[in-house]
Each structure stands twice: as C-alpha cells, then as structure tokens.
Amino acid sequence: MTRLLHAVVLAWLAVGTARGDGVGTVDELPEEEQLYAAPTRPDRIGRIAAPVMINGQGPFKMILDTGATQSVITKRVVDALGLTLHPDSKLLLHGVTGSLAVPAVELETLETGALVQRNLKVAVLGSVMGGGDGILGVQGFEGLRVTVDFVRNQVTITRSRGERARFNEGTIPAQLRFGRLLVVNGHVGRIKVKAVIDTGAETTLGNFALRDALLRRRRHSAEVDDAVVIGLNDASQYGRFIHTPMIKLGEAEIKGLHVIYGDIHVFKMWGLENEPALLVGMDVLGALERLVIDYQRQEIQFRNTFRLP
C-alpha cells in the first residue's frame, strides 16, 4: 500500500529575481544568499498561524514556518491590498521535486508582534496549503522569541530578553544555519544526526544517509510502507516509511515515530545530504503543550513529553 502525501513538505528556495522586458530571466544567487520557503498543508496535529498586518491592513492568517526564510502571500491577499504583479519580477522557487518561477511583489510593511519588516519582497502563490493567507518565513527573526501555546491556540512574537526555560520545561540547544534555519544536534538510536526544526512541514523526513545507517542495524528498524511526496508541477518523489528508534534532541525523547526516508531535495539544498539528518515536522512539534523558539539564545524550549499516536 502506498500513502500519498500531497505537498507534505514543499520546501521551496527563492534563489533569484527575474527582470527583463516581459519575460524575465532568473539569476542564481550566491550560496550564502539562498532563501527557503515551505508551504504547509492541513494535518491532524495542527498548524501555527499568526495574525499579520500587511501594508497596514489585515490581519491576515499566515502560517509560521521555521523552515522558510522567505515569506509568501496568496494572490487573494495581493488583490485585497490592491497590489500589482509585474511579469518581469519573479522569484525562482525550488521544491522537493522541482522548481518553478513565480511572481513577486514588494510590500511596504509586514507586522506581527515585535516583527516589523519594511520594503519586503515576497513570493506570490495562487493558494497556500491549509487555506491560509500566506507563509510567514523567519526573515527578520533575529533577536526575537516565538512562543506557541498549543493548548490555548496562541502564538506570540516578542523581543527576546534571554529568558531561560521554566522549571517544568525542557531545552534543546540550536544552531542557526544560513543565519536563520534552526538546526539541532541529536541522536536516532545511537546514530548522531543533524535535525532541522520545521514548523511548516506536516511529517518528519529523513535522508538516505540516516536511512542507510538505520538499515545496517536492521534489528532496530523495519521498512513499513511506500510514500509518495508530490511537489511542484505534480512531480513526485518516492520514499519509504521506516519505524524509527527513539529520537533524542536535547532533553526531548521521541518514541514510536514513523519517518519518511528518501533522496529529499531539501537536504541537498541545506548541505545535509551526506550526513544523517532529519527534518522535524508538526507530527512531532504539534504534540507539545508549549513551544518556544528563542532566536537570540539559539534555543528551543518545550513543555511536556511528546505524545505521539
């Protein structure tokens, strides 16, 4: 049996701006300037949606995506704001299974909580998974603190004051790759891994390097099912669900998780294809009561053990 996961994690990379007379050409950006954006779909666990004011209007519901450094708005929002799309201004978005040049638009302001951005270029899509008005990437999150209360269904973005975790919370030290991407060190069983924390992904993904290391310990891991990840232009990429031993990230221990393993394009874009790596999605993060991402402390704080089905 094959499970179809439509756009489970469309990790898109905005790598250039197209300008010209009518038909733009897209220029590649240097490696250090690459920007990521990942649309989100509805899931059983939940999504993190923030109310966002754009050009003084709104609020618009945008999905907070820590795997995206580039924000995205829908065509519906463009129309509501009375903005004009110019055919010679585009962003090239690379997905898990392909790439697509999409229109871009300049925003005067984008505001939510302590996040205030001005003169911001964003990509425009016809729709966003989950019915949101857009995707809130983490561009400009330096020095901020994101607090998500899953019990009260609240998200707040404030200036970090360097607060430590509460007495009943665990912590996961993080590193910032490309300046904004949250990467933590951990273990899957006895295997050391790099894990990307991605609130825009429904399902946790693993790369081939981790899969191969697990299958060499076959008594601990068993392939369960095929999976198809459908990306841009309906291009598909195949992976395998594998029952995965305990994942340990900082003080968090995650048991009983089935992870999709494949030659996932986003690991290559992140430079993580040659070492065991995970992309930790909302199937794990959404099982928390409280999640705090402190970009100044470079730390993740969480309440409660992970309650996975």
What are these regions (language model features)?
Residues 1-4:
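Positively charged n-region of N-terminal signal peptides that target proteins for export
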Residues 6-16:
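Bacterial N-terminal signal peptides
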Residues 18-309:
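Pepsin/retropepsin-fold aspartyl endopeptidases
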